[in-house]
Structures are given as C-alpha cells and as structure tokens.
C-alpha cells in the first residue's frame, strides 16, 4: 500500500513539473520587470504626446523601406497575428502539452495568450492607445510574442530532453524571428508604429513570464502535498 502511494505520488509529481528551473526564475523575474517598465514608459510617452516619437521617426521609415521589396510577404505575414491563427497556434501548443503530459505547460498556453490579448485589446488600447487611435500596443505583436515566449518557456527545460539543446535553441529563435517578422510587417503596411510593436512584444512576453512564475508557484505548492502525505500516514 505504501509503495503504491509513493508510486502514485511520483507519477503525479512528474506530471507537475516546474516550467522554469530554479536559476532561470530570477532571470524571468528580471525580464518581467523589464517588460513592465517598457510598457509603462512607452505608455506614458504616448499619453503625453500626440506626435510620433523619435523611435518611430527613426525606425518606421527604415522598416517600410526594407520590407517594401517583399510585397508577397506583406500580403500574408500580418494574417498570422490575427485572432484565428493565434487561437489555432495556441490550441496546438495546448494539445502538444497534453499529449506529452505537461500539465503546467498546457495551463500556461491556455491562459497566457488569452490574458495577453485581452489585456491589450480591452485594457491598454482603450486607455493608453486612445491618444493615437487605439493603436498601442499592437495586438498582432502581443499575440505573436506571447506564443514565442511560451515556446521558449516550454523548450528551456523539457521533461526528458530528447531534443538536443542546439535544436531547442534553434526552435526558440525561429519562433522569435517569426514574431518579429509579423510585427515588422504591421509597421511596414502602416497599421502600426515601431513603438506599438515594441509595446505589444513587451505585453505578450511579460504576461507569459508572469503566468509561468505563477504556475510554478502553484505547482510547487501542489507537489509538496503528495510528498508530505506518505510520511504523515506512516
């Protein structure tokens, strides 16, 4: 009976793995603080000025000039940041986590993206973005960088590490570059400015980091229960 309880507790604990290893939690907290700071600084600047900032004046023309040579890309890249594709990619991440029994990862993917998109569309845009026609932060950038950040969190410390570290790093960089490409395409077609894209990236990544740290905290509490129960029963 005792052995069965220990086996059950071990299986449950393996399914409730922490998303971020210990040394990376402090780094995640620092990155989260940076994302919050960037969002606040850009938001305050936008509210206090109706004119384009020096960042937009410096980067927007360069981005548009660089990407104007690729009209085909500009036709389909922005579509990936719309609600439908973002929802499908989110469901794919949730399904992958469920198949591999990464319950914490499934919770992260299921909640972080909707929270990030909802924060952008229903809180930040109506309040901060109202000064510039509700363009800040970019919803496309928010969704894509949230997905990229989730990929990074899921691949940083997978359960069995069957995928080599170099391949995992390449996958994360690919996800980040794809997010950058979608955000840049929105700037190139004039739908957003560089500031909007940076703000969306900060919101998307920041929400994912906040959710990952919260999920890990809850997971740690849940893992303590099964570990302590057999000892108390004996």
Predicted regions and their residues:
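Aromatic-anchored segments of alpha-helical transmembrane domains
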Residues: 39, 114-123, 177-187
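N-terminal transmembrane-helix/juxtamembrane module of multi-pass inner/ER membrane proteins
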Residues: 1-85, 125-129
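Interfacial segments of alpha-helical transmembrane regions
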Residues: 25-34, 90-116
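Short juxtamembrane and helix-loop transition motifs at transmembrane-helix boundaries
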Residues: 66-77, 98-103, 128-132, 157-165
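Hydrophobic alpha-helical transmembrane segments of integral membrane proteins
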Residues: 107-135
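Hydrophobic alpha-helical transmembrane segments
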Residues: 78-101, 155
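Structural signal for the C-terminal ends of transmembrane alpha-helices
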Residues: 6, 11-25, 95-103, 152-160, ...
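Membrane-embedded catalytic cores of phosphoryl/pyrophosphoryl-handling enzymes
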Residues: 129-234
């Amino acid at each position: 009976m005792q052995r069965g309880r220990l086996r059950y507790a071990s299986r449950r604990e393996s399914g409730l793995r922490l998303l971020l290893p210990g040394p990376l939690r402090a780094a995640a907290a620092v990155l989260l603080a940076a994302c919050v700071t960037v969002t606040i600084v850009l938001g305050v600047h936008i509210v206090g000025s109706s004119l384009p900032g020096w960042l937009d004046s410096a980067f927007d023309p360069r981005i548009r000039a660089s990407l104007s040579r690729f009209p085909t890309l500009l036709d389909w890249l922005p579509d990936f940041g719309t609600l439908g594709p973002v929802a499908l990619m989110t469901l794919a991440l949730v399904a992958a986590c469920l198949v591999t029994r990464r319950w914490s990862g499934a919770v992260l993917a299921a909640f972080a993206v909707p929270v990030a998109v909802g924060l952008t569309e229903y809180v930040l845009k109506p309040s901060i973005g109202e000064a510039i026609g509700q363009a800040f932060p970019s919803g496309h950038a928010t969704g894509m960088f949230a997905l990229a950040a989730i990929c990074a969190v899921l691949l940083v410390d997978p359960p069995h590490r069957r995928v080599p570290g170099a391949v995992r790093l390449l996958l994360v960089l690919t996800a980040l570059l794809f997010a950058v490409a979608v955000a840049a395409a929105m700037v190139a077609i004039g739908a957003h400015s560089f500031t909007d894209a940076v703000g969306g990236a900060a919101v998307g990544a920041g929400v994912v980091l906040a959710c990952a740290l919260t999920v890990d905290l809850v997971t740690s509490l849940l893992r303590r229960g099964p570990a302590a129960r057999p000892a108390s029963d004996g």
